[in-house]
A protein has these predicted regions:
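RNA pseudouridine synthases
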Residues: 1-266
């Protein structure tokens, strides 16, 4: 398990790297979480212990997060998230083969036809043009089961369901091997999350036949759990892999100055 890291700090916000395996917030005594990490960090500097949690990453997900250092900043960031003016981008990887008719199939064929195995689409640190034809939109309705801590795709008629929307594009298609050393294909995705539903990315990609590597809730352990994860969200060979999902970029307006700020993991 990696360690949390401070990426940026000023009088109003703290931007951090959250490693996989650490919860954003937990009720379990003695278990490390990001809230405690920041609270202790501020206490060591003789600062008020306030930590404003305005968004979350699931425990097995690594990535960049922003926390508020005061209530005014927390209110501003929370409002931006509610109004969908923040931008959150993820990298994900799957060894799935996709379901018939999935838009990804065309992307994979394009990579293969051009002998583009192991090639990468450059990702600009500025605002992504998600109107580009390379981007596809997934819209589903998701219901959450608190008893099992899982979600499922359901219908718009389900009164408990919430609309879930994301955009994605294929950024690489490479030869790989599963945990049984069978040859397969690994597909890497760039994802823009437009709504923040429970396990949304994991569930929606699994629903179109691309369960994430390392996902034991919505994937197939036999083909999705070999290798070790990395800070980039990419995966390789070895024992067991972490969940191949990384929140690599977040964009928001500074709560005090209004400046548009972008933070990208290296």
């Amino acid at each position: 398990m990696g360690k949390p890291d401070i990426i940026y700090e000023d009088n109003d916000i703290i931007v951090c790297y959250k490693p996989a395996g650490i919860a954003t917030q937990t009720r379990h005594i003695g278990q490390q979480d990001m809230e405690s990490f920041i609270r202790n960090y501020r206490a060591a500097k003789n600062e008020p212990p306030y930590v404003g949690i305005v968004h979350r990453l699931d425990q097995p997900v690594e990535g960049v997060m922003v926390f508020a250092k005061n209530q005014k900043a927390a209110a501003s960031l929370s409002r931006q998230i509610k109004e969908h003016t923040t931008e959150k981008y993820y990298r994900a990887a799957s060894r799935g083969q996709g379901v018939s008719g999935a838009a990804v199939e065309d992307e994979e064929e394009s990579f293969q036809d051009k002998s583009a195995y192991a090639s990468k689409v450059p990702v600009d640190d500025k605002k992504e043009d998600t109107h580009d034809p390379a981007w596809h939109t997934l819209t589903d309705y998701i219901s959450f089961d608190k008893r099992t801590n899982t979600s499922k795709i359901t219908s718009e008629k389900d009164r408990l369901a919430k609309k879930a929307v994301l955009q994605y594009r294929v950024i690489s298609v490479t030869p790989d091997r599963d945990s049984s050393q069978n040859e397969c294909i690994k597909t890497e995705f760039d994802i823009k999350l437009l709504t923040g539903r429970h396990h949304q990315i994991r569930l929606q990609l699994a629903h179109i036949g691309y369960p994430l590597i390392g996902d034991t809730k919505y994937g197939k352990p036999a083909s999705n759990n070999s290798g070790t994860g990395s800070k980039s969200g990419r995966t390789g060979g070895g024992a067991r892999e972490q969940l191949a999902l990384c929140s690599y970029k977040i964009v928001f307006d500074h709560p005090a100055t209004g400046e548009r700020m972008t933070f990208v993991l290296p």
